[in-house]
């Protein structure tokens, strides 16, 4: 399964307008893929909308990326978006495809999006080590997806769902205390290029 995580910088006070426009844009007849997440940042770089879309094939992802880049009104936000970055990913092969909350049972509304740099040669070891550790960690709080970038610097992004900020803090502390997280040996393959963003589900987000 392939994914795009698009990041738009928006003027203050336009998040609701943008979320509605994004839903409409993703449902247009010519659109490829499926809208899965639409989140607005709360902690980290502010005034950013994060849009997660899923694709059955790389060809569909590339076609939709081209449609968006060539559009005069990308995501229906051309008049307000100040920046747009589209990052392409492939899900870790052992992970289930991302599904909306109504199907998966995974709910936020708080989502943490973490991106880690990977050292050369570290992609497959990272995938394998996470396969061993995520099931136990998922039982503490659900991992929505772990996915490796297919362009740009070596990196992967993982997304986690929590009912509240407090629940996130407790879940992470519990996982460390139980010795189930981070994956044993996993950090050795990572660089110090790490980011974490806390974002809240918008009213139109399938991952609510």
Regions found by a protein language model. Give the residues of each.
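Short, structured motif recognition centered on aromatic/hydrophobic residues
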Residues: 2-7, 18, 49-53, 109-115, ...
């Amino acid at each position: 399964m392939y994914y795009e995580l698009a990041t738009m910088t928006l003027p203050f006070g336009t998040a609701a307008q943008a979320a509605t426009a994004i839903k409409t844009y993703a449902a247009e007849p010519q659109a490829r893929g499926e809208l899965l997440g639409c989140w607005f940042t709360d902690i980290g770089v502010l005034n950013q909308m994060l849009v997660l879309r899923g694709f059955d094939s790389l060809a569909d992802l590339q076609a939709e990326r081209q449609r968006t880049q060539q559009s005069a009104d990308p995501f229906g936000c051309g008049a307000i978006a100040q920046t747009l970055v589209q990052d392409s990913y492939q899900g870790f092969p052992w992970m289930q495809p991302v599904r909306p909350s109504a199907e998966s049972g995974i709910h936020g509304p708080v989502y943490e999006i973490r991106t880690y740099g990977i050292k050369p040669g570290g992609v497959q070891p990272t995938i394998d080590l996470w396969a061993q550790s995520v099931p136990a960690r998922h039982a503490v709080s659900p991992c929505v997806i772990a996915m490796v970038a297919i362009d740009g610097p070596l990196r992967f992004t993982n997304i986690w769902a929590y009912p509240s900020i407090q629940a996130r803090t407790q879940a992470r502390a519990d996982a460390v205390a139980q010795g189930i997280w981070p994956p044993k040996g996993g950090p050795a393959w990572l660089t110090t290029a790490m980011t974490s963003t806390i974002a809240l589900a918008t009213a139109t987000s399938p991952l609510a």
